[in-house]
Structures are given as C-alpha cells and as structure tokens.
C-alpha cells in the first residue's frame, strides 16, 4: 500500500458552476443573470453551494478591473494571451483570494488547480498554482498599488 497514489478529488461543483458562468459571460458575452440562473439550477448544488457560487460570480464580475490589475502585476504573460479557461479560473481564484472571507488561501489555490485540471488538463496547473500563490504572498503590496491606481479594494 505504500505506493498507492492519493485519490484525485473532482472539482468542487459550486466553483465549477461559477467558473462556467464567468466563462460564458466574459468569453462568450452571455448575460450574467441568464447564465447564472441556468448553471445554479443544477440539482447537485444545495442552497449553500448556490449562495457561494453566486457570491463568487457576481463578486468577481463586480471587481473585474481590480482582479485583472492584480493578475497583470504578477503574470509575465498578458492576460489576453492566456487560454480562456486559464484566464477565467485565475479570475475566480483571485476573487476568492482577495474578496472572500470564507475561503482560505490554500483552499482557493487548491480548488483553482482542480478546476483547471478538470477544464483544460494538466498542462496549466503549475501556472495557475504559481500565479495564485504569488498573488497571495504579495497581496498587501498589491492592494496598496490598486488603491494608488484608483481601483476599489
């Protein structure tokens, strides 16, 4: 049993629903309320999951300029050049790191890696993990820069 690999958990369903909505809104120009209504009607989501996903969706959309500012400060690759799923998962991850008091740094990073693995495969997991962990380390400095740039916290 010593060689047994740990079981891979599936992506969190509430976060997956939120990321799918964000993808449709930001990449396919869908209406947020229609996309959210569709994805949050999933019978696998309970009321708590729906509330979390909704807060993540609309919190991320409401703070998108600041989120993109933060991502632009730590990524060597321009946001527009990233794979659309990578860009969306990163935005949701930053939404959790910077704006959700109920999500810890390890949870935001780990669940974002699980999401990108599920949505785009293994190739982007290291990039997503690295960007989010760097943001977590530099959060105090970055929030000061965002305020100086006139962006809301």
Where does each model-flagged region fall?
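Class I Rossmann-like S-adenosyl-L-methionine
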Residues: 1-153
């Amino acid at each position: 049993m010593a060689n047994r690999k740990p079981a891979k958990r599936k992506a969190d369903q509430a976060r997956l629903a939120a990321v799918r909505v964000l993808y449709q809104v930001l990449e396919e120009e869908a209406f947020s309320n229609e996309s959210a209504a569709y994805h949050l009607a999933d019978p696998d989501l309970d009321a708590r999951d729906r509330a979390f996903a909704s807060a993540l969706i609309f919190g991320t959309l409401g703070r998108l300029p600041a989120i993109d500012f933060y991502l632009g400060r730590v990524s060597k690759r321009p946001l527009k050049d990233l794979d659309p799923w990578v860009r969306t998962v990163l935005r949701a991850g930053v939404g959790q790191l910077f704006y959700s008091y109920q999500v810890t740094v390890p949870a935001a990073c780990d669940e974002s890696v699980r999401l990108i693995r599920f949505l785009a495969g293994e190739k982007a997991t290291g990039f997503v993990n690295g960007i989010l962990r760097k943001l977590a380390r530099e959060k105090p400095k970055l929030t000061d820069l965002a305020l100086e740039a006139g962006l809301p916290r």
